[in-house]
């Protein structure tokens, strides 16, 4: 399971102070009230106003991840972006000295912008769009 070490940060509604860091499959009792959750997936999932009722189990569900297998031919400058609502949200810069990555990611549309470390002009910049699907692997090679 890609999420066996997944953590969830639990906070009282509207507060930034961490109340508890819960393991993904752990059952935990909370006082009746509303909570905000930050699920430490990639990219992160933020859920607000989760209601906890007395004598009731509240289950949080979200899509299973996919896996990105990424390969660069050599040292490169590259960044990963999430495509959402016709906008790009920066997620990660890749280490220019690493050429292979395996990243567990939430389903969605993404883009990688890449340029070889030896290319000195922006005309040599490459861009690849791809989709991560739940339960599937996506291979991207530059």
Describe the function of each predicted region.
Residues 42-64, 117-142:
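Structured interaction patches on ligand/partner-binding surfaces of diverse proteins
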Residues 6-8, 14, 21-23, 27-44, ...:
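Extended non-catalytic domains of envelope/secretory-pathway proteins
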Residues 22-44, 97-120:
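Short Pro-Gly-centered beta-turn/loop motif in secreted/extracellular proteins
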Residues 14-28, 87-103, 126:
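Short, solvent-exposed S/T- and G/P-enriched segments that are highly enriched in secreted/extracellular
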């Amino acid at each position: 399971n890609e999420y066996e070490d997944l953590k969830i940060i639990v906070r009282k509604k509207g507060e930034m102070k961490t109340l508890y860091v819960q393991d993904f499959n752990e059952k935990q009792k909370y006082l009746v009230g509303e909570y905000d959750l930050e699920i430490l997936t990639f990219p992160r999932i933020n859920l607000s106003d989760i209601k906890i009722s007395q004598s009731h189990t509240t289950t949080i569900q979200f899509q299973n991840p996919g896996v990105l297998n990424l390969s660069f031919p050599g040292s490169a400058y590259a960044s990963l972006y999430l495509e959402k609502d016709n906008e790009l949200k920066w997620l990660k810069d890749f280490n220019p000295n690493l050429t292979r990555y395996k990243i567990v990611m939430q389903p969605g549309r993404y883009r990688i912008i890449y340029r070889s470390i030896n290319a000195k002009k922006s005309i040599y910049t490459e861009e690849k769009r791809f989709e991560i699907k739940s339960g599937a692997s996506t291979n991207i090679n530059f």
